[in-house]
Amino acid sequence: MGFDVLLDQVGGMGRFQICLIAFFCITNILLFPNIVLENFTAFTPSHRCWVPLLDNDTVSDNDTGTLSKDDLLRISIPLDSNLRPQKCQRFIHPQWQLLHLNGTFPNTNEPDTEPCVDGWVYDRSSFLSTIVTEWDLVCESQSLKSMVQSLFMAGSLLGGLIYGHLSDRVGRKIICKLCFLQLAISNTCAAFAPTFLVYCILRFLAGFSTMTILGNTFILSLEWTLPRSRSMTIMVLLCSYSVGQMLLGGLAFAIQDWHILQLTVSTPIIVLFLSSWKMVESARWLIINNQLDEGLKELRRVAHINGKKNTEETLTTELVRSTMKKELDAVRIKTSIFSLFRAPKLRMRVFGLCFVRFAITVPFYGLILNLQHLGSNVSLFQILCGAVTFTARCVSLLTLNHMGRRISQILFTFPVGLFILVNTFLPQEMQILRVVLATLGIGSVSAASNSASVHHNELVPTILRSTVAGINAVSGRTGAALAPLLMTLMAYSPHLPWISYGVFPILAVPVILLLPETRDLPLPNTIQDVENDRKDSRNIKQEDTCMKVTQF
């Protein structure tokens, strides 16, 4: 396309692109922990009812005699089916007779129990405090924990829809700066939230901006790189997510108070906000939106940074206008979100992309937001997941470049469902195998997400890329919001949530097959580019063949 010619002249992968991608990698490393922060700040420790004989400091040794703590626990808390103290019930009166019984007593003589009316006692060996221990999000209130995660994802859903559209209207740069500021304020204030309601509101606002920033880093990186470098760029950005996962695991291991952990994750965002003033706007977006002078200014700036002094001097408005004449003529037709529904090929692409994003996102967040269900040491498992996803994303780069976008997605998406479904029906005693399958599932879904991100951004035109990304993000974040809510199905069957996580990626496979291949093709700039994709692709392939022949 026209802009790729200009970008090749100023440097498609030079010092500027390296610095840009490095900044976005740092951004992703510092922002991604915000998405899975509730793995630690909302960790649910072992707990039991508060009972006077055990936990009341005013009760003297004379009242309990020489009874051990285990004996006092036995007469105060009933046992569950696994012969462990129940988490949500206690005896109304101490059952002294249990000290003299080796087994259980008949059902007709079962003593009366009551809920934990005086609160709970928590095991603080893993974390000194979490939002669960601070606001007692256990027993009847345990669903509120999932609600926090869903509110964050709901915020990201609305943020992607609103900010995605605004990014196409006012530019990527200004929206990024606004989101950095919003995230820095809301996430920092969340550490000092006086009530659970205030905390939920602040996390909703944090979600509103987090995913928008991450999405815009992808878009800006894509719009400043050439097709031959695009897969590598996306892979590097996604690998930075994995580094962020490992960073959070290390921080959570060292910091056991949720307030301090929240602040530690939030304060670096202030530095990112200050640094964002040095960001460049997408010249591709500026030119497509008839801001030729600003676009030319950015291109000259990039040429200067990349050491292309001759190109910097020869770049003129006339050159830009003539090179991108086709695109500029096409965008004179006013486009809006409704243009998607008037273009049949683009419409079908968007529908397909939305379903694939939804189907991959549900198991992705279902796994990474519920690490507590997969392993006992959450911090270690978080670091392990980061290392596995990093490796998986590197592997996906090879498949993207050698097998194409569609085959790469299918190669990783289908096994996700298989790993989860097999893991669902394994007995709890096979802990090592369960952890191995869960880890493979997380690696596969990360590689599938990597392949999908590359493919999705290459299928939509520049003029509507952020808008489509916002719509696509809505379906993805609907899946992200649904993932923690599906865990409430455990009240009916412990297998139901995991069966749901396993079925969705399998259903995505036939949809992926319907999407066109985009490997080594230039980014479409207009709706007409998408509607004429077959003709343009055939011409490009013919040009590539001619180039290969003339090289010998």
Swiss-Prot record:
Transport is chloride sensitive and transtimulated by glutaric acid. Transport is inhibited by anionic compounds from different chemical classes. One of its GO terms (biological process) is monoatomic ion transport. One of its GO terms (cellular component) is plasma membrane. The keyword Ubl conjugation does not apply. InterPro entries: MFS_dom, MFS_sugar_transport-like, MFS_trans_sf. It comes from the Eukaryota. Renal transmembrane organic anion/dicarboxylate exchanger that participates in the reabsorption of conjugated steroids including estradiol-17beta-D-glucuronide (or 17beta-estradiol 17-O-(beta-D-glucuronate)), androstanediol glucuronide (or 5alpha-androstane-3alpha,17beta-diol 3-O-(beta-D-glucuronate)), and estrone 3-sulfate, as well as bile acids taurocholate and glycocholate, driven by an outward gradient of dicarboxylates such as glutarate or succinate. This is Steroid transmembrane transporter SLC22A24. The lineage of its organism: Eukaryota, Metazoa, Chordata, Craniata, Vertebrata. The gene is SLC22A24.
